[in-house]
Structure formats: structure tokens, C-alpha cells
Amino acid sequence: MSNQIETRYLSQSADPDVELRLETRDDGRPVIVGMAPPWNKWSVDLGGFKERFMPGAFRKYLDRAPNDPRGKADVVAKYNHQDSAVLGRTTNGTLDIQETDKGLVFRATPPVGTPTTAEVVPLIRDRYI
């Protein structure tokens, strides 16, 4: 089995069922909320292949217990997959991921005062992305 990480881009223009919006916490901090991938739906062409995700596809990974020898699942939400552009992380409580009947829903609270947050929040709020 390969340890290589596969990445996918969230694209509302390529898939109208993909959801991305901005909410605001009571303390004024932005929260990025989205749903991707939707279940049971073929993707756009990803370079000679298509994929679809079935309900439960991520359950084993997301449900890993803290005492699992592999460690608790550490999922990191990044803007354009850049390591320096972190929007949220499950292990520090700034990213929550849940499987729903429609797809994988995430809620990311980006860090305060970073260039990434300053760039991404207005783009989502104004529906550029």
C-alpha cells in the first residue's frame, strides 16, 4: 500500500452539489462550511478517470480512537493544498468533519491574523470560490 497522499480540489463550478459557504461565530470569527464529496455521484474527469464516493467511505478513518496505534485521525484543511495555508485541523479542534446522508460535511475555523485567512474569507464570502 502506498503512503502517497492524494489531493482533490473543491470546485463548485465543476460540481454544483459541492457546497461552500461562510458563517460567523458569536465572537465574530469566520467559519468555513462545506460539503464535499457528495455521495453516489461521479466526479468530473480527473485526468483519464472518474471517481465516486459511497456513504461510509471515510468512517473508519474518522472514527479512529485516540488510543489507536496509528493515532487519532489528523485531518488538515488547506487552501489549494499549500502546507503554509492551513484553514483548520481536527487535532486542535479547528476542523470538524462529519459524514451525513448527503456527503462529507466540514466546518473549519481558520486562524486569526494570517494572510491565508485574510485572502480566503472574502473570496468565499463574495462567492468567488
Task: Label the predicted regions.
Residues 1-129:
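Signature of dsDNA virion morphogenesis modules
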